[in-house]
Amino acid sequence: MKRTALKIGYIGTNFHGFQRQPDLRTVEEELIYHLRKLGYIDDLKKSRFRIAGRTDAGVHSLGNVISFQSEKEVRVNEINNSLPDDIQILAKAPVRFGFKPRYAEMRQYRYVLFRSDLDLYKLNEVAEIFKGTHNFTNFTKRFQKTTTRTIDDIKITKANLNDYHKKEFPNLHDTLSPVFVDIYGESFLWNMVRKMMRVFVDVAIGKLSLEKVEELLNPAENDPRANIKVLDPDYLILMDIKYDGVKFVYDDYACERFKRNLVDSLGDLQRKYAIRESMIKSLEDLERIN
């Protein structure tokens, strides 16, 4: 019996999070159903089915990881042919029997900011403050044994839109120029990235000082937890998870297939955008008539 790790891509908008929930569509439920259907797993305990990260509803992924044991040789495209278009296996790796995907060497999250009023210099300043080891108790909703985490790196870049996006959504991209915030670390608390992004935005628009950020990362023992509102999950992507000694091999056909699925979903978004744009235009015409 061999143990295999799989790297998963999915469109989070279509799921109620990763973890199984009664009567709700989740990524984990879809994966288990199709792996069972194809004969890769049966009993979850015997197959030692494990997951790396429980992303919230709306959060997307290009790199979440699951692992399991199976007598059957794992064939990526056989699984993808069974899975729905909004979730696909992108890569696989053989792993040791005791491998647990939650214990990663590095995780990379990307948050995409769509605001024209952001000061990029201030964004980079606040990024420098967050790098390193801190007490993130103010950046999670749950009480945990330890809230100390280390941010290895944060990269902030203006997005380069390719010709396809410019052609399909010309009006949209005339007004919105997204900023990518890529955050790297071994592990993250629940809601930590989205709360961090709220602070990033507040600093970049002049609503919050860098001194206050320092205070949030160095709370006194008896300080009440700060009420930091999370930013929307729809703009967060789990980009990658890496492990010491584990080499994932990406399947070219699987990656191309998922890319096509994403392009197809863009077409649907374009139609929805056009409908809303036509409704706005009609209302503006009414205002001129009146």
From Swiss-Prot:
This protein's UniProt keywords: Isomerase, tRNA processing
Biological-process GO terms, alphabetical: tRNA pseudouridine synthesis
Catalytic activities: uridine(38/39/40) in tRNA = pseudouridine(38/39/40) in tRNA
One protein family per Pfam: PseudoU_synth_1
Record-linked InterPro entries: PsdUridine_synth_cat_dom_sf (IPR020103), PsdUridine_synth_TruA (IPR001406), PsdUridine_synth_TruA_a/b_dom (IPR020097), PsdUridine_synth_TruA_C (IPR020095), TruA/RsuA/RluB/E/F_N (IPR020094)
Binding site for substrate: 109
GO molecular function, one term: RNA binding
UniProt function note: Formation of pseudouridine at positions 38, 39 and 40 in the anticodon stem and loop of transfer RNAs.
Record HAMAP family: TruA
Stored PANTHER family: PSEUDOURIDYLATE SYNTHASE (PTHR11142), TRNA PSEUDOURIDINE SYNTHASE-LIKE 1 (PTHR11142:SF0)
Record's protein name: tRNA pseudouridine synthase A
Organism per entry: Methanobrevibacter smithii (strain ATCC 35061 / DSM 861 / OCM 144 / PS)
